[in-house]
Amino acid sequence: MEPGLSGERRSMAPLLEYERQQVLELLDSDGLVVCARGLGTDRLLYHFLRLHCHPACLVLVLNTQPAEEEYFINQLKIEGVEHLPRRVTNEIASNSRYEVYTQGGIIFATSRILVVDFLTGRIPSDLITGILVYRAHRIIESCQEAFILRLFRQKNKRGFIKAFTDNAVAFDTGFCHVERVMRNLFVRKLYLWPRFHVAVNSFLEQHKPEVVEIHVSMTPAMLAIQTAILDILNACLKELKCHNPSLEVEDLSLENALGKPFDKTIRHYLDPLWHQLGAKTKSLVQDLKILRTLLQYLSQYDCVTFLNLLESLRATEKVFGQNSGWLFLDASTSMFVNARARVYRVPDVKLNKKAKTSEKTSSPEVQETKKELVLESNPKWEALTDVLKEIEAENKESEALGGPGRVLICASDDRTCCQLRDYLSAGAETFLLRLYRKTFEKDGKAEEVWVNVRKGDGPKRTTKSDKRPKAAPNKERASAKRGAPLKRKKQELTLTQVLGSAEEPPEDKALEEDLCRQTSSSPEGCGVEIKRESFDLNVSSDAAYGILKEPLTIIHPLLGCSDPYALTRVLHEVEPRYVVLYDAELTFVRQLEIYRASRPGKPLRVYFLIYGGSTEEQRYLTALRKEKEAFEKLIREKASMVVPEEREGRDETNLDLARGSAALDAPTDTRKAGGQEQNGTQSSIVVDMREFRSELPSLIHRRGIDIEPVTLEVGDYILTPELCVERKSVSDLIGSLHSGRLYSQCLAMSRYYRRPVLLIEFDPSKPFSLAPRGAFFQEMSSSDVSSKLTLLTLHFPRLRLLWCPSPHATAELFEELKQNKPQPDAATAMAITADSETLPESDRYNPGPQDFVLKMPGVNAKNCRSLMNQVKNIAELATLSLERLTTILGHSGNAKQLHDFLHTAYADLVSKGRVRK
């Protein structure tokens, strides 16, 4: 067994020189660390986790994912740490969580659990050593973490707060974004570590890997398609600006349209007025998304996959034709022509043929048989083959380096990895032919023509992969060819070993059918077992790490893995000497730099494959430039930032920790009699556990109102013993109205509380309209949201609707509604369920007969209680006279309706109906 491939996993490499400087700075003073992408914020966090893995400490970690927590725990276990971090999830009973906290060490817990435990006192706040915040740039968007830090600082003035992030671009939006983040984190220091930092740059330059940049030239057809897509993209952007003059012109540039964050940028501008936009603008936004996908497919996948996407768009031409016409531009025609030319070509019809003859013989079926398949190979495939050939040649003379070096090929996603595996296993011809057959099954006759030509001399065949010798694909795989097939477990689908194929062209029918069964264009294809008749072994998963034969070659995706550290594990366990970057990804490039620097003396060569002059190259360069500009902006902000001494909240002078009206930015309303409603009783609100995903509980708490988190079946907020609130966002409101769930909720609230309230909360940055534009000029329908809302208020007369533009307005409204009112009881609120029968509000009435009586003509919510107070049961009600009913109901018309309903015979009703007809 070879070194580095044993069952024992390797521990994380020791800190580098500049990383030690980061740790010393952060140990000296709390702060926010902003690193460049890939420079190892996880390594920094891991070091602090290791420092505090001791029962004498109690450190909380926020904003980590389960996969990351598992990775950190495993790494600490490898290093022999005894007191490992623990996870606090909903599987641990609430009454036993206090014991978990008092055992000390590192605690990974969800934000909702921590908020509830802070509010209920289950967590010993005064014993907390500190809090580590991961992905600190999200502290404003995710309100729960900010709430936790505020609760922590209110009860603990000594503990530390250290925050980490590697997303500098996130601070580039909004006004004083980084300052607001630091305010929510209660930190005064900002530590910036860009890639161009002197300490980082000088150290990594001393240990930089050998980089071989290979600028691959796109084929003429690919260049023509790229130009056409860019022309269409530019036309759509101009039209979008024309229809929406208020949009920022700089952000809607063609360069920004190529980057990944463009969809988020355009939604940021259009969301506030999305309901006011016409169909044209909405269609253009969708078109931009499709065009960006086309650009990605062009450079990422093969010619057949790209053509299949285009043809599917053409198949939905009617849908697009109603909204936008980019499919009918000249550039679109050029794109389709060149995309088809990469896959097949139709021979020119001789001009001297008579028109009648051509009409008789040019049926669609006959024309299809005249297609000659071209199946243009991806230029990067050939570059990859050349690289593997070079690596193999070097491995033959690698005795001085300790044997052949392992190879790691990194592509963007699972689909690309599967295509590379199949290409290296079967060759370009077989792979593309199989994919063509799978995608365009109806063109069977055309395939036969191409296959027949292929078996002959084949002068018309123009597949690019034929330009190199047939033995070339197999030469690179001479060592892997003898390996056994791998059957990977489901959780290891992201790891794929490159397998060899037979030397001869797969002309045998059985072999071709075998190849056709291999999935190539779907992500699931990575999990398909590659079978060969000569190899029928089921080896363990260790075979994926090359224990059987050398040199080991692994293909791994850069993105899309369920485990974010899958690639890191492969890198450190396989220890490749050669890394082939099939796709450019900034984070992994930096990760390779750190990997090389942490292994001094061990060679590492990185092959960088990129299309020269392509949108792929432009995207990579734009990402670099945006990160550099973001750091430059942060450096300027740091130089001019004014940070108050009390920012860390270690004394009582920090206003952010104050509760009540003194802490609010809004001016005090003197009409409220100076707040005389505070008569010594602390205000409180009973809140449902599920509501802690929103920002509202945090804002209520900041207003000086205590929160009692419990599990409620009826309502979301209990403000007073009589006032129950059901909170709905606009989308939730519409869904609940359509499903009937809101009716059941209002029924339960009306039954058990005197003042049921429906709170409709909408985001001020996302205005909405319950009815489409021009709806009032049309006939109203019962399916409309407005109609259903009207029916709801008619059915529940005591139900009140509250419209709030933001959680801040809701918190202020709740405070006003609670003035001079008694406080709710959490135990009573928890006891109220949809099936409750004996309750303070309804202990005198049976809910079943009450609902039945309300359905009778003449009985409504106003006279129902009077009727139930004076009549014992339904049998007695049926014996009452009209005069007695008039006295009870207080209205002669209602009394007559009820009396007629109870005493009119069914036959009389039928006869009256016939008379009316």
Swiss-Prot record:
Its EC number is 3.1.-.-. Residues 684-764 form the ERCC4 domain. Keywords: Acetylation, Chromosome, DNA damage, DNA repair, DNA-binding, Endonuclease, Hydrolase, Magnesium, Nuclease, Nucleus, Phosphoprotein, Repeat. Residues 270-298 are annotated as: Leucine-zipper 2. Acetylation at Lys-912 by KAT5 promotes interaction with ERCC1 by disrupting a salt bridge between Asp-908 and Lys-912, thereby exposing a second binding site for ERCC1. Deacetylated by SIRT1. A motif (Nuclear localization signal) lies at residues 487-492. One of its GO terms (biological process) is nucleotide-excision repair involved in interstrand cross-link repair. Residues 233-254 are annotated as: Leucine-zipper 1. It comes from the Eukaryota. SUPFAM superfamilies: Restriction endonuclease-like, RuvA domain 2-like. Its cofactor is Mg(2+). The keyword Oxidoreductase does not apply. Residues 454-524, 643-681 are annotated as: Disordered. Residues 1-457 are annotated as: Helicase-like. The modification N6-acetyllysine is found at K289, K912. Its main location: nucleus. The keyword Ligase does not apply. The modification Phosphoserine is found at S522, S765. Heterodimer composed of ERCC1 and ERCC4/XPF. Interacts with SLX4/BTBD12; this interaction is direct and links the ERCC1-ERCC4/XPF complex to SLX4, which may coordinate the action of the structure-specific endonuclease during DNA repair. Belongs to the XPF family. Catalytic component of a structure-specific DNA repair endonuclease responsible for the 5-prime incision during DNA repair, and which is essential for nucleotide excision repair (NER) and interstrand cross-link (ICL) repair. This is DNA repair endonuclease XPF. It comes from Mus musculus. The gene is Ercc4.
